[in-house]
Curated annotation (Swiss-Prot):
InterPro entries for this protein: Helicase_ATP-bd, Helicase_C-like, P-loop_NTPase, SEC_C_motif, SecA, SecA_CS, SecA_DEAD, SecA_motor_DEAD
GO cellular-component term (any): plasma membrane
NCBIfam families (alphabetical): PRK12904.1, secA
EC number(s) given by UniProt: 7.4.2.8
Annotated protein name in UniProt: Protein translocase subunit SecA
Main location: membrane
Naturally occurring in which organism (per UniProt): Anaplasma phagocytophilum (strain HZ)
Gene encoding the protein: secA
Record localization: Cell inner membrane; Cytoplasm
Family membership noted in the UniProt record: Belongs to the SecA family.
């Protein structure tokens, strides 16, 4: 019912919004003359006026939208020599309203972001502009930073190489440019820090996400994980890999849709015998017995590595390491590793060094990270196909922004061939036709392997070309700069689909940067620049007459958005262009997800070799296959989100508790200890207290108190207590007195030492147990779907079990903290002249992880080496 209502009413609501938007644009345009008449000092001083009005509460951001946008437009004209078009103003309004602005390639999304970023920066609460890679973050912050700086708005940029000091300074700027990965990992790292002073982020006010579909949808299935090595025998991966290589096709079944692999009955018996013969499991035992269950894990991952993950498609081997390739962008994902032992299995398969498995220390998802922002917006060229998901997951509506100039690109029907070989022959012939008429061609492939196959075929035909894939990513900017030159042929994976504009005739700025490297003579530089600009203009005319940039797709992607992104490289800003896809029945999408009816019909037609079919019915069938995959992937993302929402609620509780502990100014630990003691005493009484007057009961109580607190009780005095309440009061007093005595001993040496040590104990204990808890939740999540066999809802079961595990973890946390604090001892060294205090071994972990030049977490303001860093552990 809801989906029907959306289809009926959504167009109406869009038109209504459009009408109000055009009125706002008209108001902004009405101020253009007034702003143009202002002096630079008066124009750039508007920021101070706006901020004063906001601080006085006389206006809201919505009230300032029209004058603020007018100021940005005029400032941009003066500083950047770029004036916002009316359609760009509409995009800025959509962003400010917390919507997704769908804008075609080349429509100036980078400039659009300045409107909403400036307006929201006036509150001084922080605006985050999120991009997909470091290059774009640096480029946009430097480029648009000139505009912001002129308006008195501070701008920061964070990349993977930024230091903690630089990160903190950047987060404190009015506007921050960074990548989704850096923001997400900073959030996790902040919640692993040992002092608030070392945290870098300051809140989640407003974010503009560029390429929003890539970040919030494509990457949402991949969690952000900070991990540490775990002790496990990695050599088994190599031993099992050698055995799996001997398996034949009848020994296993694979499901390419879900990327899972299973041993058949015969295959399991074969693997069992191989494991026994290689002394990896005991003779006479079963592969499926409890003691060998871990071996099933190794075998399963080795099978997946060999049969479902392929070099130059899913990953590449670079400098002796297995590096994952992003399926959506075609870029290398340095630092990312497959989880659950799959990466180790791939390393064994490729014969490179097998690294240890990792344990999750902290994790989150982009879905839950970006939902922390009070207001969220985004930009992309392709969002409408995922509008339902944006609305359902992020409460983001999509506004389609019209192009400034009508799109001139011609999208031809797909050609479908029987075999891959015939398809590539047709692709090469089509490229040669374009090349002859000087029409530049961008050929999109889905993998490195396919891009290099095409490159080989073109070389055999004597066609000069460039290849852009994860192997040659360093040359990306230069290759793209030349991709629009007359007759240029560029073969690319999905890397060419994001954040880059292919200008007809070539990009003179980028070409000049490469040609002028090393030339210092200003006169010579000016002469070369003019020559490059004139050549680019001449080349553009040639390309325009040839029909503009031609896009050739060699395979349909699982997502229609990726295909649309490839097409969107052509026809920018009203330029002419052409796009065409060449497909075969052997392509992955048609083979795995296409209907048998389509394949059967094409085969019955008796197509001759080299003959292609073009029909709208076939195009619709392919679109149905893509929709089927998109719906399946959406279901996977929804399921992952529902489970992660459960974990996220616990994550928020633990992180909030952690931040409270770190807050020395407002969080008093004394009541906290007292409450912990009460909880522990209550638990001891519940478990050990049986009957009054029994010496056995008193001895059991005493033994438990000794285990936790390290002190022995007077059995006689304890036995003499007559009521349960008296026992509780007695034990409470003993516990409180012990901790008070410990605290007094520390404070006597240094008034801040006990507080520092106690908070350190709390944090390290919480972090340790949270890590174990995440591992337990991962294990629970892996098998929870089996509960559906018993007619139980896996999600509800997960919620119940996860809550039980959290209660268990907190109970262990309370006991661990009290036990550690109760056993801390201070020992003064025999040589007091060096001013050091020695703590016993039980507390040596308290001071790990703090650099000597960091501020001391005790809050003194001194460097750690001059404060508690003098404590010798």
């Amino acid at each position: 019912m809801l989906s029907i209502a959306k289809r009926v009413f959504w167009p109406y609501s869009s038109r209504a919004k459009g009408a109000s938007v055009h009125k706002i644009v008209k108001s902004i345009n009405a101020l253009e003359g007034e702003m143009a008449a202002l002096s630079s000092e008066a124009l750039f001083g508007k920021t101070g006026e706006f901020r004063k009005m906001l601080s006085e509460g006389t206006v809201t951001l919505d009230d300032l939208l029209v004058p603020a946008f007018a100021v940005v437009r005029e400032a941009s004209r003066r500083v950047l020599d770029m004036r916002h078009f009316d359609v760009q103003l509409i995009g800025g309004i959509a962003l400010h309203r917390g919507m997704i602005a769908e804008m075609k390639t080349g429509e100036g999304k980078t400039l659009v972001a300045t409107l909403a970023a400036y307006l929201n920066a006036l509150e001084s609460k922080g605006v985050h502009v999120v991009t997909v890679n470091d290059y774009l973050a640096e480029r946009d912050s430097e480029w648009m930073g000139k505009l912001y700086s002129a308006l008195g708005i501070s701008v920061g940029c964070i990349t993977s190489s930024s230091s903690d000091e630089a990160r903190k300074a950047a987060y404190n700027c009015d506007i921050l440019y960074s990548t989704n990965n850096e923001l997400g990992f900073d959030y996790l790292r902040d919640n692993m820090k040992f002092s608030r002073e070392n945290m870098v982020q300051r809140g989640y006010n407003y974010a503009i996400v560029d390429e929003v579909d890539s970040i919030l949808i494509d990457e949402s299935r991949t969690p952000l994980i900070i991990s540490g090595p775990v002790e496990r025998d990695s050599s088994l991966y190599g031993k099992v890999d050698a055995l799996v290589r001997d398996l034949e096709q009848e020994d296993y079944d694979i499901d390419e849709k879900s990327k899972t692999a299973f041993l058949t009955e015969d295959g399991a018996l074969k693997v069992e015998q191989l494991l026994i013969s290689h002394q990896l499991i005991p003779e006479g035992s079963s592969l499926y017995s409890a003691e060998n269950i871990i071996m099933m894990h190794y075998v399963g991952q080795a099978l997946r590595a060999h049969k479902l993950y392929f070099a130059d498609k899913d990953y590449i081997v670079k400098n002796g390491s297995v590096v994952i390739i992003d399926e959506f962008t075609g870029r290398m994902m340095d630092g990312r590793r497959y989880s659950d032992g799959l990466h180790q299995a791939l390393e064994a398969k490729e014969g490179v060094r097998i690294n240890n498995e990792n344990q999750t220390l902290a994790s989150t998802t982009f879905q839950n990270y970006f939902r922390m922002y009070k207001r969220l917006s985004g930009m992309t060229g392709t969002a409408e196909t995922e509008a339902d998901e944006f609305l359902g997951t992020y409460n983001l509506q999509v506004m389609q922004i019209p192009t400034n100039v009508p799109v001139q690109r011609v999208d031809l029907d797909d050609d479908i061939y029987c075999t891959e070989e015939e398809k590539y022959e047709a692709v090469i012939d089509f490229i040669i036709e374009c090349h002859k008429r000087k029409q530049p061609t961008l050929v999109g492939t889905i993998s490195i392997e396919k891009s290099e196959l095409l490159s080989k075929l073109l070389t055999m035909r004597g066609i000069k070309h460039s290849v852009l894939n994860a192997r040659y990513h360093e040359k990306e900017a230069y290759i793209i700069a030349q991709a629009g030159k007359p007759g240029a042929v560029t073969i690319a994976t999905n890397m060419a689909g994001r954040g880059t504009d292919i200008k007809l005739g070539g990009n003179p700025e980028m070409l000049a940067r490469n040609e002028l490297a090393g030339i210092t003579d200003e006169e010579e530089r000016a002469k070369r620049i003019n020559k490059i600009i004139e050549q680019a203009k001449h080349d553009k005319e040639i390309v325009m007459q040839a029909g503009g940039l031609c896009i050739i797709g060699t395979e349909r992607h699982e997502s229609r958005r990726i295909d649309n992104q490839l097409r969107g490289r052509s026809g920018r800003q009203g330029d002419p262009g052409l796009s065409k896809f060449f497909l075969s029945l052997e392509d992955g999408l048609l083979r795995i997800f296409g209907s048998d009816k389509v394949r059967g019909m094409l085969k019955r037609l008796g197509m001759k070799r080299g003959e292609a079919i073009q029909h709208k019915w076939i195009n619709r069938a392919i679109e149905r296959a893509q929709k089927k995959v998109e719906a399946r992937n959406y279901d996977i993302r929804k399921s992952l989100l529902r489970f992660d929402d459960v974990i996220n609620e616990q994550r928020k509780v633990i992180f909030a508790q952690r931040n409270q502990i770190l807050d020395r100014e407002t969080y008093d630990l004394v009541p906290f200890y007292s409450n912990l003691n009460c909880d522990i005493v209550s638990r001891i009484i519940k478990e050990k207290y049986c009957d009054l007057g029994h010496r056995e009961t008193a001895e059991e109580l005493s033994a438990e108190v000794t285990r936790i607190y390290g002190i022995e009780l007077d059995i006689g005095a304890l036995s003499a207590l007559e009521t349960r309440e008296e026992v509780i009061a007695y034990l409470d007093k003993v516990a409180d007195d012990l901790l008070k005595k410990k605290a007094d001993g520390f404070v006597h040496k240094d008034e801040n030492l006990w507080d520092f040590a106690a908070r350190r104990v709390l944090i390290t204990s919480l972090d340790h147990l949270w890590t174990d808890h995440l591992a337990a939740l991962d294990s629970l999540k892996c098998g929870i779907n089996l509960r559906s066999v018993g007619q139980k809802d896996p999600l509800n079961e997960f919620k119940i079990e996860a809550f039980y595990l959290l209660e268990k973890m907190l109970s262990r946390f309370y006991e661990m903290v009290i036990q550690k604090l109760a056993h801390i001892e201070l020992e003064v060294q025999q040589q007091p002249d060096d001013g050091m205090i020695n703590l016993n071994n039980s507390t040596s972990q308290l001071f790990g992880g703090i650099a000597r030049n960091d501020r001391c977490p005790c809050g003194s303001g001194k460097k750690f080496k001059h404060c508690h860093g003098m404590i010798k552990v």
